[in-house]
């Protein structure tokens, strides 16, 4: 929105939740838009935008529930068919449903045989309940690192599109998202925000559920470097490449050196060491050593 406004010489005011990633804020401002932060969710930000529009006469561009927005995002579906004409399954990260609605409409128009799968974060999955109720249902609470798809309720348009055009709505856990983000960074050399890797997360979690050839739509790179580091570390722990150990050893010179020597001999890379001499769980004459290790995988971690 900010870039389009800049290219057209128009003014743009963008509303975001207070939890929006810093890179997203900075990039939006760099394109010349005014940014207002308000609330904890996209729903809160949308309500603030609508109040602003009512007071100023500005036009609201809905983040997902508008025919033009859905049509624009549908061009992704056209690109999928151009680049992978033999595709059998398209998997799309989904929040409010604008992207999957557009992709499904475009793909179905040309290839009605292609299976369309929407993927939501399991702690912010607004579509299952809404589809069951036959109307948008507001989630009572959301808690996910995937802020870009943390939407409390779908729109009327997107719910209708998903009901009529999407074959399945799947959910992924925070662990799945962490693993997928690590995979994208390490294997695909892509920096993607947690919301953008939801489709990849679904594929990695249950690859046999998707008929190949499969296209996973990777959408969104707005991630704070600090969060990226945390998620990558969490992902490494989830796949058995980070190992934390608490050891009780005799309180005498050389004990810590002996522990570290054993770990080095086992081929583990020591990332962090903490040494505690006092504590209710310690016996007299012993200390606790806490170590964080990098291993080559779950088998190596078990050996260590």
Name what the model sees in each region:
Residues 1-8, 21-25, 70, 93-104, ...:
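Short glycine/serine/threonine-rich phosphate/pyrophosphate-binding segments
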Residues 5, 28, 61, 80, ...:
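Buried hydrophobic positions in well-ordered alpha/beta secondary-structure cores of metabolic enzymes
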Residues 8-11, 31-33, 55-58, 65, ...:
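Short coil/turn connectors at secondary-structure junctions
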Residues 13-89, 107, 120-173, 177:
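Small/polar-residue-rich loop-to-helix segments that shape phosphate-bearing ligand pockets
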Residues 56, 155-212:
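Active-site-adjacent helical/loop segments in soluble small-molecule enzymes
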Residues 65, 94-98, 120-125, 143-145, ...:
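Glycine-rich beta-alpha junction loops
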Residues 225-304:
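A conserved regulatory-domain signal marking ACT and ACT-like small-molecule sensing domains
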């Amino acid at each position: 929105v900010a870039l389009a406004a800049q290219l057209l010489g128009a003014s743009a005011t963008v509303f975001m939740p207070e939890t929006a990633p810093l890179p997203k804020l900075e990039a939006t401002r760099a394109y010349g838009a005014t940014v207002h932060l308000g609330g904890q969710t996209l729903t809160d930000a949308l309500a603030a935008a609508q109040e602003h529009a009512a007071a100023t006469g500005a036009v609201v561009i809905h983040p997902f529930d508008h025919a033009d927005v859905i049509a624009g995002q549908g061009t992704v579906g056209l690109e999928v068919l151009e680049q992978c004409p033999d595709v059998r399954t398209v998997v799309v990260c989904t929040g409010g449903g604008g992207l999957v609605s557009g992709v499904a409409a475009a793909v179905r128009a040309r290839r009605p045989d292609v299976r369309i799968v929407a993927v939501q974060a399991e702690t912010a999955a607004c579509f299952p309940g809404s589809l069951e109720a036959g109307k948008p249902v507001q989630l009572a609470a959301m808690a996910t690192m995937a802020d870009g798809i943390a939407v409390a309720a779908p729109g009327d348009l997107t719910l209708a599109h998903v009901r009529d055009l999407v074959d399945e709505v799947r959910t992924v856990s925070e662990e799945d998202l962490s693993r997928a983000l690590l995979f994208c960074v390490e294997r695909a050399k892509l920096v993607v925000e947690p919301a953008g890797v939801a489709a990849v997360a679904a594929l990695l979690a249950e690859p046999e559920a998707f008929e190949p050839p499969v296209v996973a739509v990777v959408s969104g790179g707005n991630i704070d470097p600090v969060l990226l580091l945390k998620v990558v570390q969490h992902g490494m722990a989830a796949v058995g490449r980070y190992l934390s150990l608490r050891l009780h050893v005799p309180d005498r010179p050389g004990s810590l050196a002996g522990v570290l020597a054993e770990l080095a001999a086992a081929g583990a890379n020591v990332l962090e060491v903490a040494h505690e001499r006092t504590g209710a769980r310690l016996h007299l004459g012993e200390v606790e050593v806490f170590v964080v290790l990098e291993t080559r995988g779950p088998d190596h971690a078990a050996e260590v």
